[in-house]
Amino acid sequence: MLSLSARPILAAFLLPKPKPRRLLLLLRHLHSSSSASALTPPTPRTTTPDLPEDADPTPLFLRPPAHPVPDASLAAFRRRAAALVPPSAPHLHRHLRWLLADASAPAPSSADPAAPHLHLLRAPLDELEALWLRHVRDRRPFQYVVGNEHWKDLVVAVRDGVLIPRPETEAVVDMVGAVEGFQDGWWADLGTGSGAIAVAVARMLGPAGRVFATDVSEVAVEVARLNVHRYGVQDKVEIRRGSWFEPLEDVKGKLMGVISNPPYIPTDDLPGLQPEVGWHEPKLALDGGKDGLDHLLHLCEGLSSALMPGGFFVFETNGNKQSEFLVDFICTKWSSSFCDVEAVLDFADIKRFVRGYRR
């Protein structure tokens, strides 16, 4: 998710390169995160004013457009916001356009041609200004500013305390869709976070299909339930709070598939993460322990009892060496339980995923 490594020599499975629409979403994500790290020096977070006390906690893009603003006031805000963008960070001008696009709605035309033209905003200008300052000065991720991430064919609600879904993780959903008979199976999404994977998989399922999504974080469970209800898949997705397999005792041995994008960053690497990630995204969703493998190994331990015979699993990893280690580990320790275990490339040609089948 966050590391870069050398192009692997071999791969068992090559994912297709991003399609044009997916490439646009990938660019939006990259311009919202990694490019900021490269172009804008960190600024102490103490410089930014707090949000207004009465600020609405609802994600910006889900709020009603209840704040009429005249042309002149909006233009003045745009000038002030643009003036904060340093010459080294031109991508922030795109973020400003996206912020105003997410915050705006068409205003009804007035019957009086002399009436001033109004813009309908989803937040008052003082709140938008505070949100913008937090993004520019505090390096707060743009996705947290607007409250969403464009992911696959979804607009996923996100907020502080929930990991922002990455474009490469979309491949997990594609791999689920390639499993024979997946539509009618029961699936587990462990460490669901925003619920993006669970919702995307649920939208592909047939009448008998179901997703059990778990997370230990109360905030993640709340946001995942919001996304499940927004997309109307509450009859397909059951969100359960708890750690990994613990909430799934009643479906043990009945799962067609287990999916997880767990924390896999080595603890010593956390201080070196770009500020957008290290300062703001939840450590709970990032820290994989000394070698980044703590949670991945725990998931491997629970797989054989969770999956039905022939069941499928796919985990996201930190890439290359971590994936290769997991493949060797599973094939050595559980050779009698699993087959067709292999590393899978992401669209950057990194061995990002490990997948396989229960015998």
Can you describe what each PLM-predicted range is?
Residues 2-4, 24-63:
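N-terminal mitochondrial targeting presequences
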Residues 290-358:
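Conserved Class I SAM-dependent methyltransferase catalytic core
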Residues 99, 139, 169, 197, ...:
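Residue-level signal for inorganic ion chemistry
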